[in-house]
Amino acid sequence: QGEILLEYADRILALSEDAARAVSESLGDAGEIRLCLRSSAVLVSNVLKDFIHEHPHVSFSISSEPKGCDLLIDSVSSAYDIPDNAHLLMTEEICLAVSSSHPLAHTGHISVEQMMDEKFIDLADTPSYAGVFNSIFSKCKKTPQIAYSCNDYILQGKLISLGLGVSFVASVTWTSSSLPENISLLHIDDCPHFRSIYYQPLGSFCSENQRIFEHQLEEYFKNLNN
């Protein structure tokens, strides 16, 4: 019974907060957008920069946990897996990033068998990366060596460019980022993988500023796809 009461208390509190925010907006308060950002931080930061420039009085709080947030931005391995009330922003191919000096760099593609002898650069504490890695090598008797582990995509790119290892990357996100140019992306021939980026409104209240931000998100990703 206690859990049921707590659940309803949380709902009532959330509704009260939404009502207070709606009143504040009607009085001209620009307010805050509470964003849960679990994917595509590099791309979303570009949208944030433009939005804040145009709407300097709107503030953002960014979290990795959805509770208490207005908007979730995340990715899944298939567009079929996005939540019912979510909006698909983009689907992009997962490729293998290698140094331009890599023997297969000029071919543009690689097989799973050819990847077995590669030294990989792991992205630590990134469930989506671990999911791709495990999925691709799930049917293999062994997995490739993890040569380095880092939690910074910039460091990851530097290590790849130096020829110290290879890594799986999201193709559009990678090519849209300011990363080393001497890196080639290889298509995975026999085990293609993709990821779908989406946004999902979380609260019952959606401010006008949030609607504008969502629209700018859609426009930005639409332009990336063109």
Residue ranges with predicted function:
Residues 85-94, 171, 180-194:
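Short beta-strand->loop
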Residues 1-25:
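Alpha-helical "hinge/linker" immediately C-terminal to small N-terminal DNA-binding modules
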Residues 80, 101-111, 191-193, 203-210:
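Short helix-loop capping/hinge motifs at secondary-structure junctions, enriched
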Residues 104, 118-140, 207-208, 224:
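Secondary-structure junction motif
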Residues 183-226:
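A late-sequence structural motif
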Residues 82-94, 98-120:
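Flexible hinge/capping segments at coil-to-helix
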Residues 68, 126-184:
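Hydrophobic hinge/microswitch elements
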Residues 29-81, 150:
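Central regulatory/effector-binding core of bacterial HTH transcription factors
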